[in-house]
UniProtKB/Swiss-Prot annotation:
<dbReference type="GO" id="GO:0009423">
    <property type="term" value="P:chorismate biosynthetic process"/>
</dbReference>
<comment type="similarity">
    <text>Belongs to the sugar phosphate cyclases superfamily. Dehydroquinate synthase family.</text>
</comment>
<dbReference type="Pfam" id="PF24621">
    <property type="entry name" value="DHQS_C"/>
</dbReference>
<keyword id="KW-0028">Amino-acid biosynthesis</keyword>
<keyword id="KW-0520">NAD</keyword>
<dbReference type="InterPro" id="IPR050071">
    <property type="entry name" value="Dehydroquinate_synthase"/>
</dbReference>
<dbReference type="GO" id="GO:0008652">
    <property type="term" value="P:amino acid biosynthetic process"/>
</dbReference>
<dbReference type="InterPro" id="IPR056179">
    <property type="entry name" value="DHQS_C"/>
</dbReference>
<comment type="pathway">
    <text>Metabolic intermediate biosynthesis; chorismate biosynthesis; chorismate from D-erythrose 4-phosphate and phosphoenolpyruvate: step 2/7.</text>
</comment>
<keyword id="KW-0862">Zinc</keyword>
<dbReference type="Pfam" id="PF01761">
    <property type="entry name" value="DHQ_synthase"/>
</dbReference>
<keyword id="KW-0456">Lyase</keyword>
<keyword id="KW-0963">Cytoplasm</keyword>
<keyword id="KW-0170">Cobalt</keyword>
<dbReference type="GO" id="GO:0046872">
    <property type="term" value="F:metal ion binding"/>
</dbReference>
<feature type="binding site">
    <location>
        <position position="156"/>
    </location>
    <ligand>
        <name>NAD(+)</name>
    </ligand>
</feature>
<dbReference type="GO" id="GO:0000166">
    <property type="term" value="F:nucleotide binding"/>
</dbReference>
Amino acid sequence: MNKRKILVPLGNKSYEVTIEAGILNNISEELLKIGITKNRKILVISNEEISNFYGEKFLNDLKDNKFQVQMFLIKAGESYKNLKTLSEIYDVAFEFGLDRNSIIIALGGGIVGDVSGFAAATWLRGIEYIQIPTTLLSMVDSSVGGKTGVNHPKGKNLIGAFNQPKAVFIDPETLKSLPKREFSAGMAEVIKYGVIRDKELFEYLEIEKNKNELINLKNEYLIKIINSSIKTKSYIVSQDEHENGVRAILNYGHSFGHVIENLCGYGKFLHGEAISIGMNIAGEIAIDKGLWSKEELERQKNLLKSYDLPTEIPKINKEDVLTILMGDKKVRNGKMRFILPKEIGVVDIYDDVEDALFLKFFS
């Protein structure tokens, strides 16, 4: 089946994720289906690279169907996910006359989606927005679940809001324009879903034929893993929208991943690459706590490596690691919470991990 639809069930904030090869070519038709009427103002937020591939055709499709359209391009890179960029979006929104009946469309990767969603949450106290993710990482992770925000010099995503999109449209064809390294980074999040809740997906990713077809970007295989990943995320988000409990398991590998991104400088590692290393650290801690076996850690490590992901821990100062971890949003009552694996497909939340258990992995 070429088209998949997944409901994210959140009461009056529920929405559908539609996965279909080529859906980007007739986006106006999809907007009309979900009740976005003609003549509404649409601010499309993207970046230069994505705009070069899809921008003109995308805007023309909207204009031809009588939508009023403006585009804003975010500079590529984590360093531009900040309040200055947000302020520039507000300026464009004001000049364009974006009102409460208007809509923002995020066309791009995770940075575009995060900033767009937060702009939508805060402009006029909130307007609707749609996610059209164009990277594997944003397809399976950041476009679903409503986490939006920008970075602060003191840490990643410290300024943000939970803001669910009106809809998510995913076109696996856009992955063909990605550098291979970006695709690999997205695979870290897919593998994460396998470790935290979907043993079947993990085993699917281990099969050599599937690996080859995925690396060669075959739509049928891409749709399968995107669909599986989003089903897991949708289920978890529906249980715990605001991350007060079980949703924290989606952060497997992320606490240490954010440390690595922050201390190595945003840009040295892509987000997915940092998460891959973070998953490896969590796996090592799980062995020290007697939670899972060395064989399972090796399976995780080998799978990450097979999709060209790093697992070696960079040299980082121990004191800096503690400082960053204590500033993490996942700290509760002064205690750090870690997501650790018990077996492939099962993880749990722990707040009893002594500093020495993880600091030994850093120089």
